[in-house]
Regions:
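N-terminal helicase ATP-binding lobe
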Residues: 1-199
Length: 199
């Protein structure tokens, strides 16, 4: 285990992070249900939860990365105009490779880019670009797409929000174009309702 992964592991099991996350969930729920933002984070809590999210976004595992994304999502409604939030959201969403959310969460990414983040963003936007499209895969989507390219048979599942149909569309386009349509493609879906998504 690397030093960074041990730091991520410590953060995931830190009771203080769990306490901050529960407070953010309550804050978000009150804001959503009652339209009142009556639960405040003190400056230390705000700084700490952003630092936790930054550490977790550097994880190679899904649990840490998901928790970082959750923290940014919970903070968004209350802090979206805050410069510090913009800086951390830019960094975290870039590390997660979530460029669709980045364009929504951060108004002007160039204003909050550091050299490290600008370079990472450029590399990911170049390498993880969807073939024959201007969109960019998220990190897990890109890993799956690359695995599909190197496999003769492949089976996978993922949550609704993962973008399975999006990946399959890109992969089928890749096969038709790059392999000149010489491969056969069979897509099995579990229900009739999903047939429309892959046709």
């Amino acid at each position: 285990m690397t030093w960074l992964e041990s730091l991520v592991n410590r953060a995931l099991h830190d009771p203080y992070l769990n306490e901050l996350t529960r407070k953010l969930e309550r804050k978000y729920a009150y804001n959503f249900l009652y339209r009142e933002d009556s639960i405040d984070l003190c400056e230390k809590e705000y700084d700490d939860v952003l630092r936790f999210a930054d550490i977790l976004s550097r994880s190679s595992g899904a649990e840490g990365r998901n928790k970082a994304y959750k923290i940014i999502s919970l903070l968004y409604d209350s802090y979206k105009d805050d410069k510090q939030f913009q800086y951390y959201a830019n960094s975290i969403l870039t590390k997660l490779g979530n460029f669709a959310s980045l364009s929504l969460a951060v108004k002007n990414t160039e204003a909050v880019d550091t050299l490290e983040i600008a370079l990472e963003k450029e590399v990911k936007m170049t390498y993880q670009k969807v073939p024959f499209n201007d969109l960019v895969f998220t990190d897990p989507q890109y890993q799956l797409f690359e695995a599909l390219k190197d496999s003769n048979h492949f089976s996978f599942s993922g949550p609704t929000s993962f973008g399975k149909s999006f990946i399959m569309d890109a992969f089928i386009q890749y096969i038709i174009t790059e392999r000149h349509g010489i491969d056969n493609i069979v897509v099995l879906v579990p229900t009739r309702a999903l047939i429309n998504q892959v046709t």
